Amino acid sequence: MDYREFFSQFKHLSEKPGIGGKIKIYPEDFIVIEEPIPSIFEGRKYAIFLLKKRNWETMAAVKEIAKRAGINYREIGFAGTKDRHAVTYQYISVPAEARERVEQVSIRDIELRFVSYGRFIKLGHLLGNRFRIIVRDVSEDAFDRTKEIVRELREKGGFPNYFGYQRFGERRVVNHIIGKLLLQGDFEGAARLFLGAHDGSMEGDEARKNFWETGDVERALEEFPGFLRYERTLLHRYKDTGNWKRAFLSLPLPIMRIFIHAYQSYLFNLYLSRRIEEGLPLNEPLVGDIVVQVKGGIPYRDRTYRVTETNLEFVREKVRKNQAMVSGPLFGFAMRRAKGLPGELEKEILEEEGLSLETFRRLPKPMAEPGGRRELLLRPMGMAYGYIQEEGMCFRFFLPKGTYATSVLREIMKDH
């Protein structure tokens, strides 16, 4: 199953026909510019560089920079990972004493420019990202269709805030399934899927296929290529211990969390799709809903309150003024649950999946997931678009952190 087939289960909010087309035919078709939080420029212990990369994964670029500069890659901070098949601009921090060495680094398709001194940049230290995207091979009436779709979605309050396919895997769409298996305590099933899932189009898929069919760990260690280092780590650990749980827990914590977060994201997407399907409004709070506060167009997901009969009109006015947004569940042991109709829908999904919120507490301690809330709608800021001859539709907009340009484009393109 590829991501298009996987995403076909999630309802579009727009009912109008899309423009079709393709993205990321060239890296320059997808430009991402990070907007950092201002506080990263406070302090003197770290040198802040603007990193421009083309066709590089963020982590791979960071490791290569560290290697060339002679520092540990863990000493380099960044606010978030950016698309690989794109041209991206983001800020990184390095120890101040390493500034000159980093300035001397020369890597193909990577540019580094010293900006100022500041503090260590942690994941999440950004406001959001600005995008410039070209969609090629679109329909002849793409501009008019885009205009109609954007108008329709503005009337409905915004774009559905689905987690993008990047959360689940573009070709091996299994991250969320692995997450569910981990929550069920099936570490062997999770490990076998992590090691063996394949679609036949990626390097190393023949080795994955052989393991999927035979379960032969010794053979897998011989056949798995070196770049599949996490898979090889897991295999070596299983060979040493004979225990799949201990083998899986040998993986770095951020890798294990990817799977739990992917499953959370799947359940959120499912909730959002069901709400659209059942005709429950996304931009009008219902009694029992949990809303998140919004300031300057940025949602603050840690500031929530419940909608009651008493405050319903007050909250509706807040939503109309874009000072609050209706939220959906990121299931976890400490998540604030909705009540009323929204709460029933949350309960229905948990029951279908055989889960309770406490299930997320029973994970090994570092992986236990408290959960939270996420706004149901996405409102691109400064959205502009136009048709460029011999290229296609060009889109420009800003999105808050944690949201996906591909989810905006999905409503316009209707390609999956």
Swiss-Prot record:
In its keyword annotation, does this UniProt entry include Isomerase? yes
Alphabetically sorted, this entry's keywords are: Isomerase, tRNA processing
Q: Which residues form the active site?
A: D83 (nucleophile)
Molecular function (GO) terms for this protein are: pseudouridine synthase activity; RNA binding; tRNA pseudouridine(13) synthase activity
Q: What InterPro entries does this protein map onto?
A: PsdUridine_synth_cat_dom_sf (IPR020103), PsdUridine_synth_TruD (IPR001656), PsdUridine_synth_TruD_CS (IPR020119), PsdUridine_synth_TruD_insert (IPR011760), TruD_catalytic (IPR042214)
Q: Where is the TRUD domain?
A: 158-379
| GO biological process, any | pseudouridine synthesis
* Reactions accelerated catalytically: uridine(13) in tRNA = pseudouridine(13) in tRNA
Its EC number is 5.4.99.27
List the transmembrane segments: none
Q: Which Pfam families match?
A: TruD
Q: Which PROSITE patterns match?
A: TRUD, UPF0024
Can the keyword tRNA processing be found in this entry's annotation? Answer: yes
Fetch the CDD domains from UniProt. PseudoU_synth
Function statement: Could be responsible for synthesis of pseudouridine from uracil-13 in transfer RNAs.
Q: What family does this belong to?
A: Belongs to the pseudouridine synthase TruD family.
What the entry lists under PANTHER family is as follows: PSEUDOURIDYLATE SYNTHASE PUS7L, TRNA PSEUDOURIDINE SYNTHASE D
Q: What HAMAP family does the record tag this protein with? A: TruD
Q: What is this protein called?
A: Probable tRNA pseudouridine synthase D
Q: Which organism is it from?
A: Thermococcus kodakarensis (strain ATCC BAA-918 / JCM 12380 / KOD1)
